[in-house]
């Protein structure tokens, strides 16, 4: 991998990690279109550490508040004593499903599921499901039903969204896409669904990144060029990712996810067309 490729892939990761359009899909598609080698699942997981740092910085106050409440609750023998402490434990519990399924299907995730056929199918399928969630929002608005805010999230919502997050193990589905969609089905506001999605991403993305970094450590140490490129891609992903978070939170306050639904369907169909015409290999 060249430095130029690392920068482009870092930008792709940062732009698409938080938008509901799948960063993994773009890290698979961009190299295929450019004629580069697939960077692999390990590269994807490690570069996500950059976007993890973006979440830590953007939601720094929320994270400090929640973490402090969890620690204080444990010290006072009242782990669920405050809403912030409860939020921390709900995030932890919501992370369990993706960890379990990730370990069970690790081989498939890193190999067969990275096929562009799977990616295009996931892009289109989630777009259809997300459009259904948007339709439900309109129905609720017509009935005068108010959407839920962060303070309204309960164990039911957290656990269901956490379970739904497991679908993100399929490349092309989008971790933020499936969790935001799950939140919308649970009547969270679009902004709240995005905020909870980003906070829920922290444990899973951190664990996946550290695991893949550990697995790849020897090969990275053996190649200074690969290590430098990975660091550059991670830094670029973090910077672009921060801007992407700010954009999406602001965007969803005023707009629906329609533009992302259209983009996902168009991209999925384009990939299938490129495969059919022999322009890219699945």
From Swiss-Prot:
GO CC term, one of those recorded: plasma membrane
Membrane topology field: Multi-pass membrane protein
Annotated signal sequence range: none
What does the entry give for GO biological process?
cell wall organization; peptidoglycan biosynthetic process; regulation of cell shape; response to antibiotic
Q: What is its main location?
A: membrane
InterPro entries named in the record: UppP (IPR003824)
Subcellular location field = Cell inner membrane
Keywords of the record, alphabetical order, are: Antibiotic resistance, Cell inner membrane, Cell membrane, Cell shape, Cell wall biogenesis/degradation, Hydrolase, Membrane, Peptidoglycan synthesis, Transmembrane, Transmembrane helix
Q: What is its EC number?
A: 3.6.1.27
Is Membrane tagged as a keyword? yes
Reaction(s) catalysed by this chain, per the record, are: di-trans,octa-cis-undecaprenyl diphosphate + H2O = di-trans,octa-cis-undecaprenyl phosphate + phosphate + H(+)
Q: Which GO terms describe its molecular function?
A: undecaprenyl-diphosphatase activity
> What residue ranges are annotated as transmembrane?
40-60, 85-105, 117-137, 158-178, 193-213, 231-251, 258-278
Q: State the PANTHER family in the record.
A: UNDECAPRENYL-DIPHOSPHATASE
Report the protein's function. Answer: Catalyzes the dephosphorylation of undecaprenyl diphosphate (UPP). Confers resistance to bacitracin.
Misc note: Bacitracin is thought to be involved in the inhibition of peptidoglycan synthesis by sequestering undecaprenyl diphosphate, thereby reducing the pool of lipid carrier available.
Membership in a protein family:
Belongs to the UppP family.
Protein name per UniProt = Undecaprenyl-diphosphatase
The encoding gene is uppP
């Amino acid at each position: 991998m060249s430095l130029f490729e690392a920068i482009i892939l870092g930008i792709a990761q940062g732009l698409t990690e938080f938008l509901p359009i799948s960063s993994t899909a773009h890290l698979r598609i961009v190299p295929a279109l450019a004629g580069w080698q697939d960077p692999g699942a390990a590269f994807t997981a490690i570069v996500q550490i950059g976007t993890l740092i973006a979440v830590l910085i953007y939601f720094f106050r929320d994270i400090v508040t929640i973490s402090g409440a969890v620690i204080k609750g444990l010290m006072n023998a009242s782990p669920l004593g405050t809403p912030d402490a409860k939020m921390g434990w709900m995030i932890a519990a919501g992370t369990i499903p993706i960890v379990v399924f990730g370990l069970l299907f690790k081989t498939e995730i890193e190999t067969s599921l990275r096929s562009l056929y799977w990616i295009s199918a996931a892009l289109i399928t989630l777009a259809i499901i997300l459009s259904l969630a948007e339709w439900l929002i309109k129905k609720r608005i017509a009935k005068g039903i108010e959407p839920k805010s962060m303070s309204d999230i309960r164990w039911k919502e957290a656990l269901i969204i956490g379970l739904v997050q497991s679908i993100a193990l399929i490349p092309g589905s989008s971790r933020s896409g499936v969790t935001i969609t799950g939140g919308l089905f649970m009547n969270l506001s679009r902004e709240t669904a995005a905020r909870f999605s980003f906070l829920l991403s922290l444990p899973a993305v951190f664990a996946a990144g550290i695991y893949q970094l550990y697995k790849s450590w020897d090969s990275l140490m053996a190649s200074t060029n690969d290590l430098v490129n990975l660091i550059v891609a991670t830094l670029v992903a973090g910077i672009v990712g921060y801007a992407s978070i700010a954009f999406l939170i602001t965007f969803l306050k005023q707009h629906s996810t329609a533009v992302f639904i259209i983009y996902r369907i168009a991209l999925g169909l384009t990939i299938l067309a490129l495969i059919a015409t022999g322009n890219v290999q699945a």
